[in-house]
Amino acid sequence: MEIPIESLWSQVLERLQVELSRPTFETWIKTASAERLENNCLVIRTPNPFARNWLQKYYINTIAHAVQDILGHPVGIYITVAQGDEVSHFSEREVSWESTNPSSIPESLPHHNHKTTELNSKYVFSRFVVGANNRMAHAASLAVAESPGKEFNPLFLCGGVGLGKTHLMQAIGHYRWKICPDCKIFYVSTEQFTNDLITAIRKDSMQSFREHYRAADVLLVDDIQFLEGKEYTQEEFFYTFNTLHEAGKQVVIASDRPPNQIPSLQERLCSRFSMGLIADIQKPDLETRMAILQKKAEDENIRLPRDVIEYIASNYTSNIRELEGALIRAVAYISIWGLPMTVENITPVLEPPNEKMAASPEAILKVVADNFDVSIDDLKGNSRRREISWARQIGMYLMRQHTSLSLPRIGEEFGGKDHTTVIYSCDKITQLHQGDRTLAQTLRQLSDRINMTSRSQKS
């Protein structure tokens, strides 16, 4: 016999109130409600998209475990937003399942056959804010999406980290897939292309590798600058590019620098990359940054006073990723501590990056090593001792914050760690410090020391 939904959710709340900290429970769990249990799936409502995304990312497994303990069997969890409308339909890909057994998934949930690969649903043209800094890149991307393989082939998107290159590339993919659901649209990072090539060589399956990539109708390749020094990968990519281009298939490439500035890039590849259109994306101006924040707030159903928007936009000028990250930190901080959204209240959690000077990796390593009483060799080593691992994770986070180094380069500074290790460390520290005042204070103190070191080195 099924438990009434009110009783089930009440028991879930009792369990989670014990497991989670009070600010976390009050902010993210207590504000949600259970809508219904249908087809072995629990539908949960949240007050806004930000809360939904936060629960989905950090607490969905905790909720699922609690429900499973109460009911005695695993259930799917579907999180939606309270908008006054009944949830009449949800798809399998929107439901999180604790059980990996396919037989436990309700047959009534439809299966989807996606032709695209690794495309983020948020990266569409309608969510891209156009400004003077990216107008040409946006127009070219839209033209390519509407008529692939024609005027701009290849399209080479060039710009610094976090300026919207990946957004535009994936928007092209989404646009083409909507028009042509049967098209083969491949989005791949240069690192993934290289890894696939290495796997093909190891498994003696080069023919399958070539057939796979050369069957694309649209090939979207991110971070092409990582072809640097990879001679055999450059060789294979050259022939893949030629095959697609000669067949009239669209190729879109993104890089943090123009083709002629990528070290050790083969001249013939540089020539091919330059034969279409190179569209440069610059840093957004103040008006564009404010528009980006306003758009992000509207998408997440967040009310932002104009002075808060202007404060964040004025202090975070480097790139969009940094800008949106500042907004997320501010909203999380305000939500957790139950404060009104004002400039005064968000200032403690937002250290204006414009007051910082670019720090050297060596300076960051030294500051972190001194603070945690470990050696730089410890930070670069492979020790899993708790205190060393913690210091290493904080070091990676700070290096991400205080330098423009890519994730692989940061990994190299820490003794050749994989970029996925850097991502994990940065995500972990970001998640923890938003609800931990002690950690937030430690990070601010370390940042101050890094900034002081940078100033002394400059003077």
Swiss-Prot record:
Provide the alphabetized UniProt keywords: ATP-binding, Cytoplasm, DNA replication, DNA-binding, Lipid-binding, Nucleotide-binding
Region annotated Domain II, chain positions: 73-117
**CDD domains to which the protein is assigned, alphabetical:** AAA, Bac_DnaA_C
Q: Which GO terms describe its cellular component?
A: cytoplasm; plasma membrane
Q: Which residues bind ATP?
A: 162, 164-166
Annotated GO biological process: DNA replication initiation; regulation of DNA replication
Q: Where is this region: Domain IV, binds dsDNA?
A: 335-459
Where does it localize? Cytoplasm
Gene3D superfamilies for this protein: 1.10.1750.10, 1.10.8.60, 3.30.300.180, P-loop containing nucleotide triphosphate hydrolases (3.40.50.300)
Read off the domain note. Answer: Domain I is involved in oligomerization and binding regulators, domain II is flexibile and of varying length in different bacteria, domain III forms the AAA+ region, while domain IV binds dsDNA.
Homology family: Belongs to the DnaA family.
Question: HAMAP family attached here?
Answer: DnaA_bact
Entry function:
Plays an essential role in the initiation and regulation of chromosomal replication. ATP-DnaA binds to the origin of replication (oriC) to initiate formation of the DNA replication initiation complex once per cell cycle. Binds the DnaA box (a 9 base pair repeat at the origin) and separates the double-stranded (ds)DNA. Forms a right-handed helical filament on oriC DNA; dsDNA binds to the exterior of the filament while single-stranded (ss)DNA is stabiized in the filament's interior.
**How does this protein assemble?**
Oligomerizes as a right-handed, spiral filament on DNA at oriC.
Q: Which NCBIfam families is this protein grouped with?
A: DnaA
Provide the protein name: Chromosomal replication initiator protein DnaA
* Natural source organism: Nostoc punctiforme (strain ATCC 29133 / PCC 73102)
